[in-house]
Regions:
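Membrane-embedded and interfacial regions of multi-pass energy-transducing membrane proteins
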Residues: 1-536
Length: 536
Protein backbone atom coordinates (compact mmCIF):
# COMPACT_ATOMS: atom_id res chain seq x y z
CA UNK A 1 0.00 0.00 0.00
CA UNK A 2 2.83 2.39 0.83
CA UNK A 3 4.46 1.82 -2.54
CA UNK A 4 1.16 2.39 -4.35
CA UNK A 5 0.60 5.67 -2.50
CA UNK A 6 4.08 6.81 -3.53
CA UNK A 7 3.66 5.75 -7.17
CA UNK A 8 0.29 7.42 -7.67
CA UNK A 9 1.28 10.41 -5.52
CA UNK A 10 4.12 11.26 -7.90
CA UNK A 11 1.72 11.21 -10.83
CA UNK A 12 -0.71 13.34 -8.83
CA UNK A 13 2.07 15.88 -8.43
CA UNK A 14 2.69 15.88 -12.17
CA UNK A 15 -1.02 16.54 -12.78
CA UNK A 16 -0.98 19.44 -10.31
CA UNK A 17 2.08 20.99 -11.94
CA UNK A 18 0.63 20.69 -15.45
CA UNK A 19 -2.49 22.53 -14.28
CA UNK A 20 -0.35 25.16 -12.57
CA UNK A 21 1.60 25.74 -15.77
CA UNK A 22 -1.67 26.29 -17.66
CA UNK A 23 -2.78 28.85 -15.06
CA UNK A 24 0.52 30.73 -15.22
CA UNK A 25 0.40 30.92 -19.01
CA UNK A 26 -3.16 32.25 -18.84
CA UNK A 27 -2.03 34.94 -16.42
CA UNK A 28 0.76 35.95 -18.78
CA UNK A 29 -1.74 38.02 -20.77
CA UNK A 30 -3.82 40.44 -18.69
CA UNK A 31 -7.07 41.84 -20.00
CA UNK A 32 -7.03 40.02 -23.33
CA UNK A 33 -7.15 36.51 -24.74
CA UNK A 34 -4.32 34.67 -23.07
CA UNK A 35 -1.76 32.31 -24.49
CA UNK A 36 -4.24 29.64 -23.45
CA UNK A 37 -7.87 30.75 -23.76
CA UNK A 38 -9.96 29.12 -21.02
CA UNK A 39 -13.11 30.62 -22.50
CA UNK A 40 -14.73 31.61 -19.19
CA UNK A 41 -13.82 32.46 -15.63
CA UNK A 42 -15.42 29.17 -14.60
CA UNK A 43 -13.01 27.12 -16.71
CA UNK A 44 -10.09 29.13 -15.39
CA UNK A 45 -11.20 28.67 -11.78
CA UNK A 46 -11.77 24.94 -12.29
CA UNK A 47 -8.17 24.62 -13.45
CA UNK A 48 -6.85 26.92 -10.70
CA UNK A 49 -8.67 25.15 -7.85
CA UNK A 50 -7.92 21.66 -9.17
CA UNK A 51 -4.21 22.52 -9.29
CA UNK A 52 -4.36 23.25 -5.56
CA UNK A 53 -6.49 20.31 -4.49
CA UNK A 54 -4.42 17.92 -6.58
CA UNK A 55 -1.08 19.19 -5.22
CA UNK A 56 -2.22 18.69 -1.62
CA UNK A 57 -4.63 15.73 -1.75
CA UNK A 58 -3.35 13.86 -4.81
CA UNK A 59 0.38 14.40 -4.22
CA UNK A 60 1.76 15.70 -0.90
CA UNK A 61 -0.48 13.86 1.58
CA UNK A 62 -0.41 10.49 -0.23
CA UNK A 63 3.37 10.71 -0.61
CA UNK A 64 3.81 11.35 3.10
CA UNK A 65 1.26 8.73 4.15
CA UNK A 66 2.73 6.22 1.70
CA UNK A 67 6.25 6.72 3.03
CA UNK A 68 4.99 6.47 6.60
CA UNK A 69 2.83 3.41 5.88
CA UNK A 70 5.90 1.51 4.77
CA UNK A 71 8.54 2.90 7.14
CA UNK A 72 6.87 3.69 10.46
CA UNK A 73 6.28 0.00 11.40
CA UNK A 74 9.95 -0.67 10.65
CA UNK A 75 11.18 2.36 12.56
CA UNK A 76 9.17 1.55 15.68
CA UNK A 77 9.90 -2.18 15.59
CA UNK A 78 6.32 -3.23 14.82
CA UNK A 79 5.50 -6.48 13.00
CA UNK A 80 3.00 -4.70 10.74
CA UNK A 81 0.91 -1.60 10.27
CA UNK A 82 -2.08 -1.24 12.57
CA UNK A 83 -5.44 -1.91 10.87
CA UNK A 84 -3.90 -3.14 7.58
CA UNK A 85 -7.29 -3.83 5.95
CA UNK A 86 -8.47 -0.33 6.79
CA UNK A 87 -5.26 1.05 5.27
CA UNK A 88 -5.85 -0.95 2.07
CA UNK A 89 -9.47 0.17 1.89
CA UNK A 90 -8.37 3.79 2.45
CA UNK A 91 -5.96 3.64 -0.48
CA UNK A 92 -8.52 2.32 -2.95
CA UNK A 93 -11.14 4.79 -1.71
CA UNK A 94 -8.58 7.58 -2.18
CA UNK A 95 -7.77 6.48 -5.72
CA UNK A 96 -11.43 6.09 -6.74
CA UNK A 97 -12.25 9.46 -5.19
CA UNK A 98 -9.50 11.10 -7.23
CA UNK A 99 -10.78 9.62 -10.48
CA UNK A 100 -14.34 10.74 -9.76
CA UNK A 101 -13.25 14.25 -8.77
CA UNK A 102 -11.10 14.82 -11.85
CA UNK A 103 -13.86 13.57 -14.16
CA UNK A 104 -16.48 15.80 -12.52
CA UNK A 105 -14.27 18.88 -12.73
CA UNK A 106 -13.78 18.36 -16.45
CA UNK A 107 -17.54 17.77 -16.74
CA UNK A 108 -18.12 21.40 -15.61
CA UNK A 109 -18.28 20.62 -11.91
CA UNK A 110 -15.66 21.76 -9.44
CA UNK A 111 -15.63 23.56 -6.12
CA UNK A 112 -17.50 26.71 -7.03
CA UNK A 113 -17.04 29.86 -9.07
CA UNK A 114 -15.90 33.10 -7.41
CA UNK A 115 -17.71 35.61 -9.63
CA UNK A 116 -20.80 34.11 -11.29
CA UNK A 117 -23.47 36.33 -12.85
CA UNK A 118 -25.99 33.72 -11.68
CA UNK A 119 -25.80 30.35 -9.97
CA UNK A 120 -24.87 28.44 -13.13
CA UNK A 121 -24.56 31.19 -15.74
CA UNK A 122 -21.00 30.22 -16.62
CA UNK A 123 -21.93 26.67 -17.63
CA UNK A 124 -21.42 24.83 -14.35
CA UNK A 125 -23.34 21.60 -14.13
CA UNK A 126 -25.11 21.25 -10.74
CA UNK A 127 -24.93 17.45 -10.66
CA UNK A 128 -21.23 17.47 -11.54
CA UNK A 129 -20.61 20.12 -8.89
CA UNK A 130 -22.42 18.03 -6.28
CA UNK A 131 -20.35 14.99 -7.19
CA UNK A 132 -17.16 17.08 -7.08
CA UNK A 133 -17.93 18.04 -3.49
CA UNK A 134 -18.70 14.45 -2.47
CA UNK A 135 -15.67 12.96 -4.23
CA UNK A 136 -13.14 15.34 -2.68
CA UNK A 137 -14.72 14.54 0.69
CA UNK A 138 -14.18 10.86 -0.05
CA UNK A 139 -10.51 11.56 -0.86
CA UNK A 140 -9.88 13.44 2.38
CA UNK A 141 -11.73 10.87 4.49
CA UNK A 142 -9.58 8.10 3.00
CA UNK A 143 -6.41 10.06 3.79
CA UNK A 144 -7.61 10.51 7.36
CA UNK A 145 -8.07 6.74 7.73
CA UNK A 146 -4.54 6.19 6.43
CA UNK A 147 -3.24 8.72 8.94
CA UNK A 148 -5.05 7.00 11.81
CA UNK A 149 -3.42 3.69 10.85
CA UNK A 150 0.05 5.28 11.00
CA UNK A 151 -0.58 7.00 14.34
CA UNK A 152 -2.10 3.86 15.86
CA UNK A 153 1.06 1.96 14.90
CA UNK A 154 3.25 4.53 16.65
CA UNK A 155 1.12 4.63 19.78
CA UNK A 156 0.36 0.94 20.26
CA UNK A 157 3.14 -1.13 18.67
CA UNK A 158 6.39 0.33 19.97
CA UNK A 159 8.80 -2.32 21.31
CA UNK A 160 10.08 -2.69 24.84
CA UNK A 161 12.05 0.36 25.97
CA UNK A 162 10.96 2.71 23.18
CA UNK A 163 9.12 5.69 24.62
CA UNK A 164 7.95 8.57 22.47
CA UNK A 165 11.28 10.25 23.20
CA UNK A 166 13.12 7.37 21.49
CA UNK A 167 11.09 7.60 18.29
CA UNK A 168 13.09 8.27 15.10
CA UNK A 169 12.54 11.84 13.96
CA UNK A 170 10.54 10.84 10.89
CA UNK A 171 8.12 8.77 12.97
CA UNK A 172 7.95 11.57 15.55
CA UNK A 173 7.21 14.13 12.83
CA UNK A 174 4.45 11.92 11.42
CA UNK A 175 2.93 11.60 14.90
CA UNK A 176 2.92 15.39 15.31
CA UNK A 177 1.74 16.12 11.76
CA UNK A 178 -0.85 13.35 11.77
CA UNK A 179 -2.29 14.63 15.03
CA UNK A 180 -2.75 18.09 13.50
CA UNK A 181 -4.34 16.57 10.38
CA UNK A 182 -6.77 14.55 12.50
CA UNK A 183 -7.76 17.69 14.39
CA UNK A 184 -8.08 20.00 11.37
CA UNK A 185 -9.26 17.93 8.41
CA UNK A 186 -12.58 16.88 10.02
CA UNK A 187 -13.33 20.59 10.43
CA UNK A 188 -12.58 21.08 6.74
CA UNK A 189 -14.87 18.15 5.95
CA UNK A 190 -17.56 19.83 8.05
CA UNK A 191 -17.20 22.97 5.92
CA UNK A 192 -17.56 20.76 2.86
CA UNK A 193 -20.64 19.02 4.28
CA UNK A 194 -22.33 22.34 5.08
CA UNK A 195 -21.70 23.52 1.53
CA UNK A 196 -23.06 20.28 0.09
CA UNK A 197 -26.24 20.30 2.20
CA UNK A 198 -27.02 23.92 1.32
CA UNK A 199 -26.10 23.31 -2.32
CA UNK A 200 -28.78 20.59 -2.55
CA UNK A 201 -31.50 23.13 -1.76
CA UNK A 202 -33.64 24.63 -4.48
CA UNK A 203 -31.98 28.00 -3.89
CA UNK A 204 -28.62 27.92 -2.09
CA UNK A 205 -28.65 30.85 0.31
CA UNK A 206 -25.07 31.17 1.56
CA UNK A 207 -22.90 28.15 2.23
CA UNK A 208 -23.83 26.26 -0.93
CA UNK A 209 -23.82 29.27 -3.26
CA UNK A 210 -21.19 28.60 -5.89
CA UNK A 211 -19.37 31.85 -5.18
CA UNK A 212 -18.94 30.86 -1.51
CA UNK A 213 -17.91 27.20 -1.70
CA UNK A 214 -14.20 27.76 -2.24
CA UNK A 215 -14.07 30.57 0.29
CA UNK A 216 -15.11 28.15 3.04
CA UNK A 217 -12.42 25.66 2.04
CA UNK A 218 -9.45 27.87 1.16
CA UNK A 219 -8.08 28.15 4.72
CA UNK A 220 -6.50 24.72 4.32
CA UNK A 221 -4.06 26.17 1.75
CA UNK A 222 -3.34 29.30 3.77
CA UNK A 223 -1.04 30.22 6.63
CA UNK A 224 -0.79 28.78 9.28
CA UNK A 225 -2.53 25.52 8.32
CA UNK A 226 -0.45 24.90 5.22
CA UNK A 227 2.69 24.36 7.34
CA UNK A 228 1.12 21.26 8.93
CA UNK A 229 1.71 19.44 5.65
CA UNK A 230 5.46 20.10 5.72
CA UNK A 231 6.25 18.97 9.28
CA UNK A 232 7.58 15.56 8.08
CA UNK A 233 10.18 17.41 5.99
CA UNK A 234 11.94 18.12 9.29
CA UNK A 235 11.73 14.48 10.33
CA UNK A 236 13.10 13.18 7.04
CA UNK A 237 16.04 15.60 7.13
CA UNK A 238 16.56 14.75 10.80
CA UNK A 239 16.99 11.07 9.95
CA UNK A 240 19.17 11.64 6.87
CA UNK A 241 21.69 14.32 7.84
CA UNK A 242 23.15 12.69 11.02
CA UNK A 243 23.61 9.41 9.12
CA UNK A 244 25.26 11.27 6.23
CA UNK A 245 27.56 12.93 8.80
CA UNK A 246 28.41 9.65 10.50
CA UNK A 247 27.59 10.98 13.97
CA UNK A 248 24.62 10.91 16.32
CA UNK A 249 22.15 13.79 16.44
CA UNK A 250 23.05 16.25 19.18
CA UNK A 251 20.34 17.73 21.40
CA UNK A 252 17.80 15.16 20.25
CA UNK A 253 15.10 16.34 22.63
CA UNK A 254 15.40 19.90 21.35
CA UNK A 255 14.90 18.62 17.80
CA UNK A 256 11.75 16.82 18.93
CA UNK A 257 10.51 19.93 20.71
CA UNK A 258 11.11 22.00 17.57
CA UNK A 259 8.98 19.61 15.52
CA UNK A 260 6.27 19.68 18.18
CA UNK A 261 6.35 23.48 18.28
CA UNK A 262 5.94 23.66 14.52
CA UNK A 263 2.92 21.39 14.84
CA UNK A 264 1.34 23.64 17.47
CA UNK A 265 1.99 26.73 15.35
CA UNK A 266 0.47 25.17 12.23
CA UNK A 267 -3.02 24.40 13.53
CA UNK A 268 -5.13 26.81 11.49
CA UNK A 269 -8.73 25.62 11.66
CA UNK A 270 -9.63 28.84 13.50
CA UNK A 271 -8.27 31.02 10.67
CA UNK A 272 -11.25 30.88 8.31
CA UNK A 273 -11.72 34.29 6.60
CA UNK A 274 -15.18 33.31 5.34
CA UNK A 275 -16.51 33.09 8.90
CA UNK A 276 -14.03 35.53 10.48
CA UNK A 277 -13.15 38.27 7.96
CA UNK A 278 -10.86 40.07 10.45
CA UNK A 279 -8.72 37.04 11.24
CA UNK A 280 -5.68 38.48 9.39
CA UNK A 281 -5.53 41.31 11.95
CA UNK A 282 -5.85 39.11 15.03
CA UNK A 283 -2.85 38.70 17.30
CA UNK A 284 -2.93 34.89 17.35
CA UNK A 285 -2.95 34.64 13.55
CA UNK A 286 -0.15 37.18 13.13
CA UNK A 287 1.95 35.65 15.91
CA UNK A 288 1.67 32.15 14.46
CA UNK A 289 2.64 33.41 11.01
CA UNK A 290 5.80 34.99 12.40
CA UNK A 291 6.75 32.44 15.07
CA UNK A 292 6.57 29.43 12.71
CA UNK A 293 9.99 30.56 11.51
CA UNK A 294 11.53 29.90 14.95
CA UNK A 295 11.23 26.08 15.23
CA UNK A 296 12.46 25.69 11.66
CA UNK A 297 15.56 27.77 12.45
CA UNK A 298 16.11 25.86 15.71
CA UNK A 299 15.84 22.52 13.93
CA UNK A 300 18.17 23.58 11.12
CA UNK A 301 20.63 24.87 13.71
CA UNK A 302 20.58 21.50 15.45
CA UNK A 303 21.30 19.71 12.17
CA UNK A 304 24.10 22.15 11.33
CA UNK A 305 25.66 21.65 14.77
CA UNK A 306 25.56 17.89 14.26
CA UNK A 307 26.90 17.91 10.70
CA UNK A 308 29.94 20.10 11.44
CA UNK A 309 31.05 17.60 14.09
CA UNK A 310 30.98 14.77 11.58
CA UNK A 311 32.20 14.16 8.06
CA UNK A 312 29.44 14.75 5.53
CA UNK A 313 29.41 12.30 2.63
CA UNK A 314 27.82 13.44 -0.61
CA UNK A 315 24.59 11.68 -1.57
CA UNK A 316 21.44 12.52 -3.48
CA UNK A 317 19.30 12.22 -0.37
CA UNK A 318 21.55 14.64 1.51
CA UNK A 319 21.27 17.27 -1.24
CA UNK A 320 17.52 16.78 -1.55
CA UNK A 321 16.94 17.03 2.21
CA UNK A 322 18.92 20.28 2.39
CA UNK A 323 16.99 21.72 -0.58
CA UNK A 324 13.70 20.76 1.06
CA UNK A 325 14.71 22.44 4.32
CA UNK A 326 15.77 25.62 2.52
CA UNK A 327 12.46 25.74 0.63
CA UNK A 328 10.58 25.41 3.91
CA UNK A 329 12.69 28.17 5.45
CA UNK A 330 11.87 30.52 2.56
CA UNK A 331 8.17 29.67 2.98
CA UNK A 332 8.30 30.56 6.68
CA UNK A 333 10.12 33.82 5.96
CA UNK A 334 7.56 34.73 3.28
CA UNK A 335 4.76 33.90 5.70
CA UNK A 336 6.26 36.16 8.36
CA UNK A 337 6.49 38.97 5.81
CA UNK A 338 2.96 38.32 4.59
CA UNK A 339 1.34 38.71 8.02
CA UNK A 340 3.61 41.44 9.41
CA UNK A 341 1.39 44.42 8.58
CA UNK A 342 -0.81 44.22 11.71
CA UNK A 343 2.26 43.52 13.87
CA UNK A 344 3.93 46.71 12.68
CA UNK A 345 0.59 48.44 13.11
CA UNK A 346 0.85 47.78 16.85
CA UNK A 347 4.20 49.58 16.87
CA UNK A 348 2.55 52.51 15.15
CA UNK A 349 1.12 53.54 18.52
CA UNK A 350 4.60 54.88 19.30
CA UNK A 351 4.56 57.12 16.26
CA UNK A 352 1.35 57.43 14.28
CA UNK A 353 2.79 58.85 11.07
CA UNK A 354 6.19 57.51 10.02
CA UNK A 355 5.02 53.90 9.57
CA UNK A 356 1.83 54.72 7.64
CA UNK A 357 3.24 54.02 4.20
CA UNK A 358 4.92 50.76 5.22
CA UNK A 359 1.81 49.44 6.96
CA UNK A 360 -0.42 50.32 4.02
CA UNK A 361 1.97 48.55 1.66
CA UNK A 362 2.15 45.44 3.85
CA UNK A 363 -1.63 45.30 4.18
CA UNK A 364 -1.90 45.51 0.40
CA UNK A 365 0.05 42.24 0.17
CA UNK A 366 -2.94 40.40 1.67
CA UNK A 367 -5.12 38.84 -1.00
CA UNK A 368 -2.28 38.73 -3.51
CA UNK A 369 -0.33 35.80 -4.90
CA UNK A 370 2.08 36.18 -1.97
CA UNK A 371 -0.18 33.67 -0.21
CA UNK A 372 0.19 31.38 -3.23
CA UNK A 373 3.97 31.74 -2.98
CA UNK A 374 3.89 30.58 0.65
CA UNK A 375 1.65 27.64 -0.24
CA UNK A 376 3.81 26.64 -3.20
CA UNK A 377 7.06 26.76 -1.24
CA UNK A 378 5.58 24.68 1.59
CA UNK A 379 4.03 21.97 -0.58
CA UNK A 380 6.98 21.71 -2.98
CA UNK A 381 9.28 21.51 0.06
CA UNK A 382 7.18 18.53 1.16
CA UNK A 383 7.53 16.90 -2.25
CA UNK A 384 11.31 17.45 -2.22
CA UNK A 385 11.49 16.04 1.30
CA UNK A 386 9.64 12.89 0.26
CA UNK A 387 11.93 12.50 -2.76
CA UNK A 388 14.89 12.77 -0.37
CA UNK A 389 13.29 10.02 1.69
CA UNK A 390 12.83 7.87 -1.39
CA UNK A 391 16.52 8.11 -2.29
CA UNK A 392 17.51 7.37 1.31
CA UNK A 393 15.08 4.53 2.02
CA UNK A 394 14.79 3.05 -1.51
CA UNK A 395 17.01 0.05 -0.60
CA UNK A 396 14.62 -0.72 2.26
CA UNK A 397 11.41 -0.08 0.32
CA UNK A 398 12.34 -1.57 -3.05
CA UNK A 399 15.55 -3.54 -2.48
CA UNK A 400 17.43 -1.32 -4.94
CA UNK A 401 19.33 1.94 -4.62
CA UNK A 402 18.24 4.77 -6.87
CA UNK A 403 20.80 6.50 -9.08
CA UNK A 404 22.75 9.11 -7.11
CA UNK A 405 23.48 11.31 -10.11
CA UNK A 406 19.85 11.37 -11.24
CA UNK A 407 18.84 12.24 -7.69
CA UNK A 408 21.28 15.15 -7.56
CA UNK A 409 20.05 16.35 -10.96
CA UNK A 410 16.44 16.18 -9.78
CA UNK A 411 17.39 18.23 -6.70
CA UNK A 412 18.93 20.95 -8.87
CA UNK A 413 15.96 20.89 -11.24
CA UNK A 414 13.40 21.08 -8.43
CA UNK A 415 15.33 23.88 -6.73
CA UNK A 416 15.57 25.87 -9.96
CA UNK A 417 11.88 25.33 -10.68
CA UNK A 418 10.87 26.48 -7.20
CA UNK A 419 13.06 29.58 -7.40
CA UNK A 420 11.42 30.59 -10.69
CA UNK A 421 7.85 29.54 -9.89
CA UNK A 422 7.64 30.46 -6.22
CA UNK A 423 9.98 33.43 -6.50
CA UNK A 424 7.93 34.96 -9.32
CA UNK A 425 4.82 34.71 -7.14
CA UNK A 426 6.62 36.53 -4.33
CA UNK A 427 7.55 39.34 -6.71
CA UNK A 428 4.05 39.48 -8.21
CA UNK A 429 2.61 39.60 -4.70
CA UNK A 430 4.71 42.68 -4.02
CA UNK A 431 3.41 44.07 -7.34
CA UNK A 432 -0.17 43.51 -6.06
CA UNK A 433 -1.27 40.75 -8.43
CA UNK A 434 -4.49 39.40 -6.95
CA UNK A 435 -5.21 35.77 -6.25
CA UNK A 436 -8.20 33.92 -7.80
CA UNK A 437 -8.31 36.25 -10.82
CA UNK A 438 -9.45 35.98 -14.40
CA UNK A 439 -10.52 39.32 -15.85
CA UNK A 440 -8.59 42.59 -16.13
CA UNK A 441 -10.65 44.40 -13.45
CA UNK A 442 -8.91 42.29 -10.82
CA UNK A 443 -5.59 43.91 -11.86
CA UNK A 444 -6.59 47.52 -11.26
CA UNK A 445 -4.20 47.85 -8.30
CA UNK A 446 -1.22 46.22 -10.02
CA UNK A 447 1.83 48.46 -10.09
CA UNK A 448 3.18 47.25 -13.44
CA UNK A 449 1.10 44.88 -15.57
CA UNK A 450 3.97 44.24 -17.99
CA UNK A 451 6.17 43.09 -15.10
CA UNK A 452 3.39 40.85 -13.75
CA UNK A 453 2.92 39.25 -17.18
CA UNK A 454 6.68 38.72 -17.51
CA UNK A 455 7.01 37.07 -14.11
CA UNK A 456 4.04 34.82 -14.83
CA UNK A 457 5.91 33.55 -17.88
CA UNK A 458 8.96 33.01 -15.65
CA UNK A 459 6.68 31.16 -13.22
CA UNK A 460 5.40 28.92 -16.01
CA UNK A 461 9.00 28.07 -16.93
CA UNK A 462 9.61 27.25 -13.27
CA UNK A 463 6.58 24.97 -13.32
CA UNK A 464 8.06 23.14 -16.29
CA UNK A 465 11.30 22.62 -14.35
CA UNK A 466 9.37 21.31 -11.34
CA UNK A 467 7.53 18.90 -13.63
CA UNK A 468 10.85 17.80 -15.12
CA UNK A 469 12.28 17.24 -11.63
CA UNK A 470 9.45 14.90 -10.65
CA UNK A 471 9.70 13.26 -14.07
CA UNK A 472 13.36 12.46 -13.39
CA UNK A 473 12.40 10.75 -10.14
CA UNK A 474 9.72 8.70 -11.90
CA UNK A 475 12.23 7.78 -14.62
CA UNK A 476 14.80 6.71 -12.02
CA UNK A 477 12.21 4.59 -10.19
CA UNK A 478 11.25 2.96 -13.48
CA UNK A 479 14.82 2.10 -14.47
CA UNK A 480 16.26 1.25 -11.05
CA UNK A 481 13.27 -0.53 -9.50
CA UNK A 482 10.79 -1.70 -12.13
CA UNK A 483 13.49 -2.67 -14.66
CA UNK A 484 15.78 -3.77 -11.77
CA UNK A 485 18.83 -1.85 -12.98
CA UNK A 486 19.56 -0.34 -9.57
CA UNK A 487 22.32 -1.46 -7.23
CA UNK A 488 21.05 -4.17 -4.87
CA UNK A 489 24.33 -4.86 -3.06
CA UNK A 490 24.32 -4.23 0.68
CA UNK A 491 20.68 -3.18 0.44
CA UNK A 492 20.04 -4.05 4.08
CA UNK A 493 22.03 -1.04 5.32
CA UNK A 494 24.05 0.80 2.66
CA UNK A 495 24.35 4.07 4.61
CA UNK A 496 25.18 2.89 8.15
CA UNK A 497 21.78 3.89 9.50
CA UNK A 498 21.01 4.61 13.13
CA UNK A 499 17.41 3.39 13.42
CA UNK A 500 15.63 0.04 13.52
CA UNK A 501 14.53 -0.17 9.88
CA UNK A 502 18.15 -0.84 8.89
CA UNK A 503 18.41 -3.90 11.16
CA UNK A 504 16.19 -6.12 9.00
CA UNK A 505 16.28 -7.43 5.45
CA UNK A 506 15.50 -5.29 2.40
CA UNK A 507 12.66 -5.52 1.53
CA UNK A 508 11.67 -6.78 4.99
CA UNK A 509 10.20 -10.28 5.50
CA UNK A 510 6.74 -11.04 6.82
CA UNK A 511 6.60 -9.79 10.38
CA UNK A 512 9.44 -7.33 9.65
CA UNK A 513 11.79 -8.65 12.38
CA UNK A 514 12.94 -12.15 13.30
CA UNK A 515 12.64 -11.25 17.00
CA UNK A 516 11.03 -8.36 18.84
CA UNK A 517 13.67 -5.62 19.16
CA UNK A 518 14.60 -4.08 22.50
CA UNK A 519 15.38 -0.36 22.45
CA UNK A 520 16.87 1.85 25.17
CA UNK A 521 17.83 4.97 23.19
CA UNK A 522 16.87 6.88 20.06
CA UNK A 523 19.82 5.49 18.05
CA UNK A 524 19.55 1.72 18.62
CA UNK A 525 21.94 0.72 15.83
CA UNK A 526 24.55 3.33 16.74
CA UNK A 527 24.39 2.51 20.46
CA UNK A 528 23.01 -1.05 20.75
CA UNK A 529 24.15 -1.44 24.37
CA UNK A 530 22.46 0.27 27.31
CA UNK A 531 24.37 3.56 27.10
CA UNK A 532 21.38 5.85 27.72
CA UNK A 533 19.47 8.11 25.38
CA UNK A 534 20.84 11.35 26.82
CA UNK A 535 21.82 14.25 24.58
CA UNK A 536 25.46 14.45 23.66
Amino acid sequence: IGRLYIFFGLFGGMLALILNILVRFERASIGSVGILDFGSSNQFFQTWSLSRTSLLFFCVLPLLIGLATYLVPLQVGAPSLSFPRAAALAFWAWLIGILIHVVTVFADGGLGEPNPTSQFAQGMDPEATELSILSIGMVVLALLVGTVCVIATIISQRPQGMTLFELPLFSWSMLVAGSIWILALPIWLSNLAISWVDFLGADALRYGAVENIWGQLSWLWSQPMIFAFAIPVLGIAGDIIPVSSGVSQRQYRIQQIAIGAMGALSFGAFAQPFFNPDVADQAVFVSMGILVLVPILVFMGGLADTSIRGNLSFSAHLVLSVVGMLALLVAAAASAFHVSGPAIGAIQEINDSWLDGLITWLRDVHGTVMATAVMEHVLIASVIGVVAGLYYWSPKIFGYQLNRNVGALSAITLLGGLVLSGGSNIINGILDEGDEVFNSSAYEGVWDTDAVEFFNIIGAIGGVLLLAGIGLVVLDLTISVILRKGNSENANDPWGGHTLEWSTDSPPPSGNFSAAPVVDNERPLLFPAVTGGDDQ
